[in-house]
Amino acid sequence: KYIGADVDVPAGDIGTGGREIGYMYGQYKRLTGLYEGVLTGKGLTFGGSLARTQATGYGLVYMLDEMLKHNGKEIAGKTVLVSGSGNVAIYAVEKAQQYGAKVVAMSDSNGYIYDADGIKLDVVKEIKEVRRGRIKEYADAVPTAVYTEGKGIWTIPCDIALPCATQNELNLDDAKALLANGCFAVAEGANMPSTREARSEEHTS
């Protein structure tokens, strides 16, 4: 009654991955007898998309690349901050690094890591995708990294900021800090990560 191909198509998010979507899809089929496009993020055996895990993070960086080209800039050689450490953040980092960016920070709900030498994504993937650990474990594994508790990732000097964690994570003070520290581009990977005041500050600066 409340979900359907022409009603509402739920997707995974924080704490809800392919397994949980699979459970929901199985129950939907049991109740309706229908095999249709009603949930995104399903496994391939249930009709899911091959690159679903990477799609949002990769797409964010593709969009960023076009945005910068339009303004006579490029991703290569730029210093980047990425909030979050889930699928969107991990694959935004991966694609940004492929484009030649230096990603120096990532975060989770407890704090953030800063690695002046650039984030070692294989270490992050091991921690987050294999061990399901916390981002602070990165600092234990990488001597050049520093872990800081709390929300302070946007105070780090950068060229580009990619908020990929959660809604309203980037507020007015964060926007002012980014601009004061040389950030010239903000591209959003999460759903509405910037507050209205932050967006206004970014657009008028």
Regions found by a protein language model. Name each.
Residues K1-L50:
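N-terminal ligand-binding/catalytic initiation module
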Residues A5-D6, K73-G77, I156-D159, A177-A185:
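Short, surface-exposed connector motifs at secondary-structure boundaries
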Residues P10, L81-V82, I160-P163, A185-E188:
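Short catalytic-loop micro-motif centered on adjacent basic/acidic residues
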Residues T16, L44-Q54, G182, R199-S200, ...:
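N-terminal glycine-rich phosphate-binding loop for ADP-containing cofactors
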Residues G17, F46, V88-I90, G111-D115, ...:
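Flexible loop/turn segments at secondary-structure boundaries
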Residues R30, D65-K73, G152, Q167, ...:
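Conserved helix-loop functional segments at active or binding sites
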Residues T40-G43, G48-T155:
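Glycine-rich phosphate/diphosphate-binding loop of Rossmann-like nucleotide-binding domains
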Residues A165-S205:
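Rossmann-fold NAD(P)-binding glycine/threonine-rich loop
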